[in-house]
Design a protein with these regions (language model features):
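Rossmann-like AdoMet
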Residues: 1-67, 71-131, 283, 289-292, ...
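Short glycine-enriched loops at secondary-structure junctions
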Residues: 11-16, 176, 223-227
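Alpha/beta-hydrolase-fold catalytic nucleophile elbow
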Residues: 97, 137, 222
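Short, glycine/acidic-enriched loop or turn micro-motifs at the edges of active sites
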Residues: 101, 140, 226
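Conserved adenosine/adenylate-binding substructure
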Residues: 125-142, 197-210
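A mobile, often basic/glycine-rich helix-loop segment
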Residues: 133-185, 232-245
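Long, Lys/Arg- and hydrophobic-enriched amphipathic alpha-helices
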Residues: 179-346
Length: 346
């Protein structure tokens, strides 16, 4: 079967899928996302949303849409941070797009008591029409990829099959994909033999762009990946905060792959929407004032609290193996009439 089919079965099968049957987030799960590292992340995303709403002309009604909200931590912190803007809170209706019953239940627990209407949806297309501010943190990396490998007679699809011993293995389709070179960026066409190229279906990004064009507004997408299309296998599996073989324990471990921000931007712009970035996550959070927010939180805290805030700050904006600041990137999408979204000025 294609790699994309394998990923979709492992992650989203209604009875056995990884995301549909469990809560994988947090210290007790398999991985930790930026909102789980510190409240500062969600608070700053909330301020970005409020500033974007003002830039939109402060409409009386606005849909606040999150794709793949996890446990609801980011949205909870974001809405708490914008309590100082009652007009924005009064205008907002929150729409959470998530197919996982387990995570929806967790989101309900996290967000209960907030004085904001909240609705759940299976897809972005299900969200009612109107001006929207869309946020997606570590959403696109979990969308299924296809893989091809270059050989002397062209590009061949990489697939997954069952070996004689019953184990899953990668295989290569015998026939090359006809005229596949014509679809690739120049730097990919020039790749060496045995190079692996990955790509995703562009329909989820196109849905975001269409929504912005139809109803007005903006979107903020944060994920890990590379700025330009490139070769190299990035499919990875994570379980219990450690890397694993993606072909073992299907449905029991997380499968992701790097986001190709060049391809993502092209898909978004194909709808007429305008994109900004990508910029590093560290740059986004610095421009939104994370260092000032950290200092404020530390001002009245204990030594232990200050140390924890410093550690979280280093994780969110630091570089290298322990930091998320350079691997994670942000891209903004807006209606052409909106202008440059907050934090994305050159």
């Amino acid at each position: 079967m294609p790699v994309s089919q394998y990923m979709n079965l492992c992650l989203f099968d209604p009875q056995h899928g990884y995301y549909t049957t469990r809560n994988p987030l947090g210290a007790g799960g398999d991985f930790i996302t930026a909102p789980e590292v510190s409240q500062m992340f969600g608070e700053l995303i909330g301020l970005w949303m409020a500033a974007t709403w003002r830039q939109m002309g402060s409409p009386e009604n606005v849909r606040i849409v999150e794709l793949g909200p996890g446990r609801g931590t980011m949205m909870n912190d974001a809405l708490r941070a914008v309590q100082v803007m009652p007009a924005f809170r009064a205008a907002a209706v929150v729409d959470l797009v998530d197919i996982s019953p387990a995570l929806r239940a967790e989101q309900q627990r996290t967000l209960e008591g907030l004085a904001v209407p909240i609705m759940w949806h299976q897809t972005l297309e299900d969200v009612p029409p109107g001006p929207a501010i869309i946020v997606a943190n570590e959403f696109f990396d979990a969308l299924a990829i296809n893989q091809v490998i270059k050989q002397d007679d062209g590009w061949h699809e990489r697939r997954i099959a069952i070996a004689d011993d019953g184990k899953l293995v990668f295989t290569v389709r015998a026939e090359p994909i006809a005229h596949f070179d014509m679809l690739l960026p120049p730097q990919i066409r020039a790749a060496h033999d045995d190079a692996i190229f990955e790509w995703r279906a562009d329909s989820p990004a196109i849905e975001v762009g269409k929504r912005i064009m139809d109803g007005g507004g903006a979107a903020l997408i944060i994920d890990y990946g590379h700025e330009e299309s490139s070769v190299g296998e990035t499919l990875q599996a994570v379980g219990s905060h450690a890397f694993a073989d993606p072909l073992t324990a299907p449905g029991q471990i997380d499968l992701t792959a790097h986001v190709d921000f060049q391809a993502l931007a092209q898909s978004l712009e194909s709808t007429g929407a305008k994109t900004y970035g990508p910029i590093l996550q560290s740059e986004l959070l610095r421009r939104l004032g994370i260092q000032t927010r950290a200092a404020t939180l530390k001002a009245n805290g204990s030594r232990e609290t200050s140390a924890a805030i410093d550690a979280a700050l280093a994780r969110l904006i630091g570089f290298g193996r322990t930091g998320m600041g350079d691997l994670f990137k942000a891209i903004a999408v807006g209606h052409p009439k909106l202008g440059t979204p907050p934090a994305f000025d050159p």
